[in-house]
Amino acid sequence: MTTQGITVLGIDPGSRTTGWGIVREVSGVLTLVDCGAVRPRGDEFSDRLGAIYHGLHEVIARHMPDEASVENVFTAKNAASALKLGQARGAAVAACAAHHLPVASYAPTEIKKTIVGVGRAEKEQVSFMVARLLGVKGDWGPDTGDALAAAICHLNMRRLRRLAAG
């Protein structure tokens, strides 16, 4: 960590929409750097995975974060959905790896509990708290809100690990 603090890219993977958000922490103060979503077009699944990879690759090259935090895949409506979600997550992690970015993974319930205090919080509650923590108006979509939550969760967990280490 430099005197400029640490910058974390949070990612909420999805085959239709992959949210991303970049949060910087300096002396315990969180600042929103940028956020958005990669929305692949087309029916060919491999093309969508490529779009996720390239979209995040561009975000990382533009903002040069120090670390990344990616929401883990635990549940889906069915096995096929879980597989697609896992592949989208793989494309996101590969984009981070191409930039030698350390990647942390957190379960959705862990992220929600860190941000809202409840592991089963609704997406709207998460977005509301993310906006409050960042001191901004939260006019992003749910995927971007979840990505920002993943970044904040990682910053909080990092701080706790440093405190525990003494």
Swiss-Prot record:
Active-site residues annotated for this sequence: 12, 71, 143
Gene: ruvC
Primary subcellular site in the record, as a coarse category: cytoplasm
Organism in which the protein naturally occurs: Oleidesulfovibrio alaskensis (strain ATCC BAA-1058 / DSM 17464 / G20)
InterPro entries xrefs: RNaseH-like_sf, RNaseH_sf, X-over_junc_endoDNase_RuvC
Function: The RuvA-RuvB-RuvC complex processes Holliday junction (HJ) DNA during genetic recombination and DNA repair. Endonuclease that resolves HJ intermediates. Cleaves cruciform DNA by making single-stranded nicks across the HJ at symmetrical positions within the homologous arms, yielding a 5'-phosphate and a 3'-hydroxyl group; requires a central core of homology in the junction. The consensus cleavage sequence is 5'-(A/T)TT(C/G)-3'. Cleavage occurs on the 3'-side of the TT dinucleotide at the point of strand exchange.
Cellular component terms per the entry's GO annotation: cytoplasm; Holliday junction resolvase complex
Pfam families linked to this entry: RuvC
Entry keyword set: Cytoplasm, DNA damage, DNA recombination, DNA repair, DNA-binding, Endonuclease, Hydrolase, Magnesium, Metal-binding, Nuclease
Assigned EC number: 3.1.21.10
PANTHER family for this protein: CROSSOVER JUNCTION ENDODEOXYRIBONUCLEASE RUVC (PTHR30194:SF3)
Name of the protein described by the UniProt record: Crossover junction endodeoxyribonuclease RuvC
